[in-house]
Amino acid sequence: MAKYKPTKLRIERARRVSESLSAKYGLIEWVPRYNAGEELVYTILSQHTSDINSERAFKNLMNHFQTLDAVADADVDDIEQVIRSGGLARQKAPRIKRVLNEVKQEVGSFDLSFLMEMPLDQAKKWLTKFNGVGPKTAAIILCFSFGLPAMPVDTHIFRVAKRLKLIGPKINADKAHERLEPIVPPEEVFQFHMYLIKHGRDTCSARFPRCNECNLGEICPSFGKV
């Protein structure tokens, strides 16, 4: 399958969006959040819950078990009890145990630094072969653990990108990852990701976007129409 190439219009619009949001939010520096194995677990815990809840559940998990090896060896019921504060613990506990054991069986450890040496597409393919690891989870690991130019697309980014027409109306969230990555230079992917999240949370909300407060009014095709 041929690699997607964005139109010049979308590339230029993304440049203007990034420039405007950079003026508003300033430089957001990349710093590694967790190692890749921990990021994998954290991402599972973050599904369908708030950042506060997922952070609490992750801290509880690591404080209790100390290492990912111990989590992988633990009973599912024990994991479930420890992560209960994060929500959907009954679904997430077996998912965490299963994927950790799959990774350990394949690699022998939870050191995934070898992914940095792979082409980005191959690193994504390697990660998404594991149960429960989709494009978003793979992109989060590659972006937040290694600083690679992978674009995680959450609900905020997906919504804002649709309204800005950076992606087409029929593109789903999974496809949005491959469509949004190439519209900005690789070194700006993390910044662009963070800018769109902040804009989605602060201004371009789902139900009542504050277009009157938006600094993208001259750029956005949906300005005042949502």
Regions found by a protein language model. Give the residues of each.
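Catalytic cores of DNA base-excision repair glycosylases
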Residues: A2-V226
